[in-house]
Amino acid sequence: MAYRLITQVVVVGSRVLGRAFAEAYKQAAASSQYQRAQQKNGNAATGRASLTSGMTLDEACKILNVNKPADGTAANMEEVMERFKRLFDANDPEKGGSFYLQSKVVRARERLEAEIKPKMEEKQAEEEVKEGWNPKIYKDR
């Protein structure tokens, strides 16, 4: 009779563990599928930047008080750098500022750079293609 009880405990326990592992596998598969879909939708650069800095584009724009980058112009990047320098210096811990706020300002700049730099590089490449490649080989030309 003790063998029957032990056998039942083992069978019921293995069923419970089997179901738990199956459910955990389903959740892991769904999570990885969702992550692949996010990267496939073109959010790869945005997702990477968001994962590294942990900050959304809206949050970064609010911290530095700039508009969302529309076309990735150099003027937009200059504005970001100007605001960054001012806020970074204002929150210097040696001058009574907050290191936490200073690090938030740095993360906001990094997030905006990750968004603007690829657009600027793409724009420069398009301009090069439009103008053509004109190497300056001779001084008189």
Swiss-Prot record:
Source organism, top-level taxon: Eukaryota
A molecular function GO annotation: protein domain specific binding
Keywords: Membrane, Mitochondrion, Mitochondrion inner membrane, Protein transport, Translocation, Transport
One of the GO BP terms on file: protein import into mitochondrial matrix
One GO cellular component, as annotated: PAM complex, Tim23 associated import motor
Family matches, as Gene3D superfamilies: DnaJ domain
Subcellular location per the Swiss-Prot or TrEMBL entry: Mitochondrion inner membrane
Region (Disordered): 119-141
Membrane topology per record: Peripheral membrane protein
Oligomeric and partner information: Heterodimer with tim14/pam18. Component of the PAM complex, at least composed of hsp70-5/ssc1, grpe/mge1, tim44, un-4/pam16, pam17 and tim14/pam18.
Cited function: Essential component of the PAM complex, a complex required for the translocation of transit peptide-containing proteins from the inner membrane into the mitochondrial matrix in an ATP-dependent manner. In the complex, it is required to regulate activity of mtHSP70 (hsp70-5) via its interaction with tim14/pam18. May act by positioning tim14/pam18 in juxtaposition to mtHSP70 at the translocon to maximize ATPase stimulation.
Protein family according to the UniProt entry: Belongs to the TIM16/PAM16 family.
Protein name per UniProt: Mitochondrial import inner membrane translocase subunit tim16
UniProt gene name: un-4
